[in-house]
Amino acid sequence: AVDKKNKMKFISKFLSVDNEGEVKTPTHGLHHFQWNHGEQKPRIHLRIDADDSGLLMINANRVFHLNPSATYMAYYALHHTPPQRAATQLARKFDFDKKALHQDYVNYEQSLVDLIDERACPICDLEIETTLPFSSTPCAPYRMDLALTYRCNNACSHCYNARPRSFPELSAEEWHKIIDHLWDLGIPHIVFTGGEPTLRNDLPDLIRHAEKNGQITGLNTNGRKLADPSFVESLVDAGLDHVQITLESHNPEIHDKMVVTPGAWQETIKGIRNALASKLYVMTNTTMLTHNHQSL
């Protein structure tokens, strides 16, 4: 059995119990939780829609669509609400038998822990009621990519950006407002892209602003500025969660030819190594063209 008192320690932007011990009713919108469990600190988002259905997202890469009763149980369980109090609230909301709800909630808590720990299949092993993906239209996207700039320190001929490199950029204050608006819309995951987003000197500030909201943040980059370990450290300290680095080939000549920048491969490789040495989740991206397909 799982020791929930030691295990389920959540930091939330919303409190479920007031000073008098009364459990608060779940509110529509986006709720953020961080579960501290040893070295693992899953980022959990619960989005409650206007019809009381919900979206449970774990680390921005696993998404579960919940019916209203499962959504409310998740809200109370993530706030570590005692079963007796949760059952009382659930009985009022859904007009179900309180005793049956009490046992359902206890089972649900355990299922939720197993789900977050990735110890169980959400379809085969768990009793959590979900709805099939694509069976309904979500109220908001799961993720939003933000093109911070169209400037770039590479010159790839295959670049898909339609904007000129000199296209005007938004200020940090304008991006703060956009990031806040995305949170208000219920979008828990944002990725900074470009152009080359690391050319923005205020990138750590933008990451930090999103982190304060509770959003998961990622970065799409050619990795060259990550060759500076102190720059990587500044992004990690700001709260960056993951990075995707474009590497066109293991062959320096092929890579540099594709990005039309001599010496770029060396910096990108250093950037990848520095990212791997950090707490970031790291991915690489490769564009398959006639220049490199035979060496992939």
List where the protein language model places each region.
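Acidic, low-complexity/disordered tracts enriched in E/D and polar residues
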Residues: 2-75
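Long, charge-rich, low-complexity alpha-helical segments
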Residues: 3-18, 62-145
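Conserved alpha-helical substructure of the radical SAM core
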Residues: 93, 107, 125-242
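Conserved radical SAM core fold
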Residues: 197-199, 223-226, 241, 245-261, ...
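Short acidic, glycine/proline-enriched helix-loop-strand junctions
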Residues: 200-202, 206-222, 253-267, 271-274, ...
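Short, electropositive alpha-helical surface patch
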Residues: 208-210, 247, 293-296
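Conserved strand-turn element in the central/C-terminal portion of the radical SAM core barrel
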Residues: 271-295
